[in-house]
Amino acid sequence: YECHGGLTDLLGVADVVIDCSPGKVGASNLEKYQSAGVKWVFQGGEKHAMTGMSYTSSANHAENLNVDGTRVVSCNTTGLSRTLVPLYNHCGQLSVECTMIRRAADPGDSSKGPINAIKPVLKVPSHHGPDVMTVKPEISINSMAVAVPTTIMHVHVIVAQLPEGHGLTTESVIEMWSKQPRIILMNGGETGITTTAEVMEYARDIGRKWGDLHEIFVWRDGVKLEGNTLYYFQAIHQESDVIPENVDAIRALMGTESDW
């Protein structure tokens, strides 16, 4: 295929545009898409207020059916939703506190940092928890975040309060997640996969292009339910977990799939 023409030519033949421009740039493109009558999908770097709709497959596919446009939430919000939404659907109520241990930069972003520091996000809560409520407002969630000098993954430390009478055990929570798409559960002690570096080596070992891991990774032996309090860790490959969400968002906007 020979690439030629400009944005006007593209919008003349497109049904939907996935806008992956840098954060806060997409707003300048919105009017162009609307004028051309083209549907649009922005990314998590844009604000929910700009689009009025946000999307993640596990939380609100149906609400996004046939809309003019939406915003796929960030990699972290996507990862939180994948494990929290099944819990909410079972319990009918959920209160969550989480800490996001964020990679400092993507592997190719050599100009970013920190390099030899841990940098807290001093805006509390960080945007990640409130962003979950743009796709599942019934979940009560707050988050804090720190950036650490690594490039390969984020890690979430999650404490979820379940309601009385939830009927779950540590084992049944793990079983629930094992039935969900886009979640990988492994026992770190048994497999030796106890760090994010080893998780990404696993992605390469199973033949994923670019070493991508579209699923989120939950350590089985890091899951513990004590009474009504659930503790767990999960790892997020920030470069790839939203890719299938964008594909699902296209299907929702075009009305071709009623369920993700």
Task: Name what the model sees in each region.
Residues 1-4, 94-95, 99-233:
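C-terminal substrate-binding/catalytic lobe of Rossmann-fold NAD(P)-dependent oxidoreductases
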Residues 18, 165, 238:
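Glycine-/small-residue-rich active-site loops that bind phosphorylated ligands and cofactors
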Residues 5, 12, 75-82, 123-131, ...:
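Conserved active-site and cofactor/substrate-binding residues in soluble primary-metabolism enzymes
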Residues 228-260:
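Generic C-terminus detector
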Residues 42-44, 64-68, 121-125, 167, ...:
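Glycine-rich loops and low-complexity Gly/Arg-rich segments
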Residues 16, 137, 178-182, 251, ...:
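Generic surface-pattern signal
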